[in-house]
Amino acid sequence: MRLLSTLRALALGLGLAGGVLTAPPAFAAELAHADFGAAPASAEARNFADWVMASGDNHGMPFIVIDKVRAELFVFHPDGRLRGASPALLGLARGDRSVPGIGDRKLASIRPEERTTPAGRFVAALGADLGTRDVLWVDYADAISLHRVITTKPSERRLERLASPTPADNRISYGCINVPADFFDAVVQPAFTGTDGIVYILPEVRPLGGVFTAYRPAGSDSTR
């Protein structure tokens, strides 16, 4: 999870740092609604994905909506069609902000209460971590990525957590998003090959409108 300064400098130069959404783009999206197909999803995730398409906030790029409350994510084609859905493992601690400077710290120094998956809108791109793995970098500055599930510590039971029917046991990581390896290879990697994309991580503590200030649910004239 710890990031080399050279990687951070490159990421900042490419504009890959995460941030809070402040305004939608001016161009119209191809679809007025996101198409979840037969995938079950919360009303909040559906409404948010619909807003992405109606506002064109994804700028014609592939996008992911991560529902932290339900510990699941949805990968969409640029036109709003669902490419795939999966359970996900998230940061051990509840919370919507990363601790300042956490990307510079060694894993051993990160306390349990600091292991959060931040909420927000992030421009994401495929790349390599500090080893040899390919990952989807979500926030370089805070060393948050989406990657294949880590199975090097059997005691953490990460595969079992992903397979369980409840999101209650999906909190185990230092903040990164873990998905099944097959899902990463078949859905995430092809979606982001040759292109950047947007990752939206919905908050679990802060109000949705406090993170995405331009968001308006369908049929509403007020910020949620």
Across the structure, where does each feature detected by a protein language model lie?
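Exported/periplasmic cell-wall-interacting domains
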Residues: 114-224
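N-terminal, Lys/Arg-enriched amphipathic/low-complexity engagement segments
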Residues: 29-43
